[in-house]
Amino acid sequence: MSEQESDEVKRMKQLEEARKRVEELKKKKNKKNKGKKNKNSSATGSIGSETPDLEGTPGEESTQEETVKANSTKSENNDQNDVDEESEEKEIEQVKSDPSGTTEKDIEEINSTSSNVGKDDAENTKKEEVQEVIKNNNDEQTADAGKTIEPQEEKKIVQTQEGNEPSNTSEAADDLFANDGNEESDFLTTIKKQKEEDELTKLRAENEKLTQENKQLKFLNMENETTVDDLQDQLQEKEDIINGLQNDLQTARDELIAAVEKLKLAEAKAARNTTATPIQFADFNTSSNNLTPSQSVTNSGTQVAHGNNMEVDRVMLNKWRQWNVDMTTWRSIGSGPIMEF
């Protein structure tokens, strides 16, 4: 069995127990009411038997004794009714106070049973009031009979009072039924008020939670705004640095381009200023072979000096730079003339 089925079974059992309790209370009340009726009938019989003795006694003493007896019976009946009602209310409240087993339908059923019990109580109280009124009237009639000793007039008075009693009892019944309706309405209103109070407490708790969450979100929003501002400031600083570096790079590029252009112009000017010189071959004499070593050294020195004073073609040298060697002043090994390349 599932949890729902077990809960339903528990509720049904509790309802059956409540109904049984209400029925038992009804039976107890009916028994008590029957006992009260028997007591009242015995009291009326005793009063009727005492009426002939009252003829010789004064009327005031008899009326006082009878009123005292009636008041004592009323107080006893009222005390018993109060005790019964308190016990019933306690049991009904115990049934209603079970939060796990009772629902709205169950409460309505219990209320209907309690209202029926209240109606029965009202009817019983009405009957008791009628009996008390009859007793009082009988007492008054006996007092009048003791004074006047006119049984025929007593019968007429009893008949007239009995004719007036139904109207009084109907009014009392209307008042009692109205009170029962008010009790039911009061019970329902209390339930509604309790529900409204519960809803209000829930809504207040939710409102408090939402307000706290709103405050937390506001603080988070403020923190996020501050972090965003800081990041924006940092980004602005980085952008300024980048812009400065870009400007420096642009100026460096411009300077480099200007330097390259100047170098090109200088090279062009140097190329224009240089004049091409023809290749000159050295004049070799045959007598040079017969020269002495000292003479050959002097001749080579003069040739070297002459070669240094020569103007060299820079264009040709640049063309053969780094892979050709200038061998114009070199002397070949062996015999033969010295040639200039």
Swiss-Prot record:
Q: Which proteins does it associate with, and in what oligomeric form?
A: Interacts with GRH1 (via C-terminus), probably forming a heterooligomer consisting of a GRH1 dimer and a BUG1 dimer.
Q: How does it sit in the membrane?
A: Peripheral membrane protein
Has keyword Metal-binding? Answer: no
**Coiled coil stretches, renumbered:** 2-41, 188-272
What residues bear N-acetylserine in this entry?
2
- What protein is this chain from? Binder of USO1 and GRH1 protein 1
Which gene is annotated as encoding this protein in its UniProt record?
BUG1
* Keywords carried by this UniProt record: Acetylation, Coiled coil, Cytoplasm, ER-Golgi transport, Golgi apparatus, Membrane, Phosphoprotein, Transport
Composition bias of kind Acidic residues appears in 79-91
Spans annotated as Disordered: 1-181
Task: Locate the compositionally biased regions of type Polar residues.
Answer: 69-78, 158-171
Task: Recite the other comments.
Answer: Present with 5220 molecules/cell in log phase SD medium.
Residue list for modification Phosphoserine: 87, 170
Q: Example GO molecular function term?
A: identical protein binding
Q: Where is the composition biased (Basic residues)?
A: 27-39
| Top-level taxon of the source organism | Eukaryota
Which residue stretches does the UniProt record annotate as biased composition, category Basic and acidic residues? Answer: 7-26, 118-132
- What GO biological process, any one, is recorded here? endoplasmic reticulum to Golgi vesicle-mediated transport
Using the UniProt record, give the first listed, main subcellular location.
Answer: cytoplasm
User: What are the record's GO terms for cellular component?
Assistant: cis-Golgi network; cis-Golgi network membrane; COPII vesicles tethering complex; cytoplasm
Task: List where in the cell it is found.
Answer: Cytoplasm; Golgi apparatus, cis-Golgi network membrane
**Which residues are reported to carry the modification Phosphothreonine?**
292
Q: According to its UniProt entry, what is the function of this protein?
A: Involved in ER to Golgi vesicle-mediated transport by either facilitating USO1-dependent and -independent tethering or increasing target accuracy of fusion events of COPII-coated vesicles.
